[in-house]
């Protein structure tokens, strides 16, 4: 299954895409920077990102929750 779940702007020419994709028979969570190709408005994936097995979703959510907690405690959010 290849499905983009969320897309948000990183800057004027790049966006972050979060989704699920299949690679070599493995289902992966993919968080990746996509960039606009020069001279067009087509977006292409870059090597900047991370793919991980879908079974790591719980650990990923826990880590992001901890990051959010620390940022709030530090008054950064």
Where do the model's predicted regions map?
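A generic short-segment signal for beta-strand/edge and adjacent turn/coil regions
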Residues: 1-2, 17-22, 76
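Negatively charged, low-complexity tracts enriched in Asp/Glu with abundant Ser/Thr
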Residues: 1-12
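Mixed-charge, Lys/Arg-enriched low-complexity segments
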Residues: 50-77
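A short, structured beta-strand/loop element
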Residues: 16-48
């Amino acid at each position: 299954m290849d499905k983009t779940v969320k897309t948000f702007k990183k800057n004027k020419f790049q966006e972050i895409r979060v989704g699920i994709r299949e690679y070599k028979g493995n289902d992966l969570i993919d968080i990746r920077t996509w960039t606009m190709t020069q001279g067009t408005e087509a977006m292409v994936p870059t090597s900047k990102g991370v793919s991980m097995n879908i079974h790591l979703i719980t650990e990923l959510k826990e880590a992001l929750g901890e990051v959010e907690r620390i940022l709030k405690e530090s008054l950064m959010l």
